[in-house]
Amino acid sequence: MQRGIQGYTIPQGTGNERYGTFVPHPLPPDPAIVWSNQLRNKFDQAILALGRLDSMAMLLPDTTLFLYTYVRKEAVLSSMIEGTQSSLTDLLLFELDEVPGVPLDDVREVSNYVAAMERGIMRIRDGFPISLRLIREIHAMLLKQGRGADQTPGEFRRSQNWIGGTRPGNAIYVPPPANLVLDCMGDLEKFINDIPEQTPVLLKAALVHVQFETIHPFLDGNGRLGRLLITLILLQQGFLHQPLLYLSLYFKTHRNRYYELLTLVRTEGRWEEWLDFFAEAVIITATQAVEAAQQLLELLEQDRLRINQLQRIRLSCLHVHRALSERPISNARWLVERTGLTSMTVNKALVQLQALGIVQPHTAQKRNRTYAYTDYIAVLNRGTELPPPA
């Protein structure tokens, strides 16, 4: 359904530098969403896919084995959409104080995203509502260091921003003027918290993401925070108990269509097309997450069986193997801290695991060498490959 423009334009500028800022109408869309049989079926499938993902998470023998890397995979993917050149391996190396293979600012951005996501999840689990205060708190974590640290972290913008182009006058899109950001975000806060009426959770997450991107309330970090809001809404409303859904994988793969639909919603009110795209993203991503978890569980079990065939230091190898399943790129120092084993025992276990082909050295130095659980990382890395150099 084409509703026409979903807001109004305020003329700005003087002389030859004239442009219009776009102010969106508050949610929900008006006229209301038209639920065709196809769209309703797509949303039903998405809800079922989320249910399967959540059930799988509840049945995992140890969710912590997956959470550490799944959260970081989403951080890498979401940051890639914004042009950051950091792989999952780069992030894991950075967290070990090792030198990654890309500029440090790129990895810091991804590391900030992890910290922001973990802060948001902690607040949600502590019973905090998704409020403007929480959104600003998460944003402060997102831009706490590296690029963007000078873009007023944790504060709504007080100046005009724009998307595309070199200035508002030649931009692709110019969000609301700074003096209306708080009003727009206040309306969005009410909608998130079901004021004045309740909205189905998955529909809410889909609508809120577009509205947040349209308002663009911060000078930097809007895309990453807008995608993070999807996860937080699903967690807060009980649709997911663990943050194992990484929609950024689908958005990255279909990046052009993603941005096209954000524009079509604003300019023509084509919400149904966005909702179809969003539901498809949930179905595919949730299904892939379940499959990846199953593959990782099978890999862990197969490798444990191989380790159990060892005649010497079998138990020590099992302890180190379990620690590597938490952090599949680790060094001896971290493994000693995590397992409580001596440095000598950890190094002997790593030699045995390398002989079995389970781990490979990732760095050449002899002291505190970094090791990679290669097959485990290969499963996680699907979809996070860096684009080829231009």
Regions found by a protein language model. Name each.
Residues 1-390:
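FIC/Doc superfamily catalytic core
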